[in-house]
């Protein structure tokens, strides 16, 4: 059975998101939506995910992305594994099942590392580990009939964290105004000379 799990702030339980995930092959999804999780730290999110996994029970393998698109800290998979007491493997590019174990390939700076894992584990897949599956109309219609379980954060009784990270603000880097300059390319040699001159004036050459 393939179970999708997501936790987060308001909007994480959007029906369209659940349907899209179920249409890609999941059997069911389990969701924890709570406003307090909108700015939760990595350790807090990992603790909630661990409690959800314990709630599901009898989980053989947890597969995550390597990082989130917003913070990209790459911390949740390893912290989650620590919460569960399971081994963690990052930058996974391939997973193959074999008798009583998993054969895992992971990218390393000078090549590929091959690992054999027995027992439950947390594997963080690299961004190019698999091509996203595009669900068809039949998949989306079937997804509407699959179960979606909504869990209350309070019911999970997540142990309090000794240290808590709080987001105190966000800022968008200021962009320098760009100087646009059009160059007539009717005469290639003249255009090239104008381009070189413009780049020198801008300090790019």
Enumerate the language-model features and the residues they cover.
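N-terminal glycine-rich FAD/FM-binding segment characteristic of electron-transfer flavoproteins
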Residues: 1-205
């Amino acid at each position: 059975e393939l179970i999708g799990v997501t936790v987060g702030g308001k909007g994480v339980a959007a029906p369209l998101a659940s349907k899209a995930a179920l249409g890609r092959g999941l059997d069911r999804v389990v969701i924890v939506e709570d406003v307090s999780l909108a700015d939760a730290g990595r350790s807090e999110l990992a603790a909630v995910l661990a409690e959800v996994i314990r709630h599901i029970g009898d989980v053989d393998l947890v597969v995550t992305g390597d990082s989130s698109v917003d913070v990209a800290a790459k911390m949740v998979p390893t912290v989650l594994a620590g919460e569960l007491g399971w081994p963690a493997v990052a930058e996974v590019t391939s997973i193959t099942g074999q008798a009583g174990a998993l054969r895992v390939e992971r990218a390393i700076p000078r090549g590929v590392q091959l690992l054999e894992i027995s027992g439950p584990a947390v594997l963080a897949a690299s961004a190019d580990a698999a091509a996203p599956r595009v669900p068809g109309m039949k998949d989306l219609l079937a997804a509407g009939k699959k179960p979606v379980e909504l869990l209350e954060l309070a019911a999970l009784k997540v142990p309090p964290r000794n240290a808590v990270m709080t987001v105190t603000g966000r800022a968008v880097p200021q962009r320098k105004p760009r100087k646009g300059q059009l160059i007539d390319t009717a005469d290639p040699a003249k255009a090239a000379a104008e381009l070189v001159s413009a780049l020198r004036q801008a300090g790019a050459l």
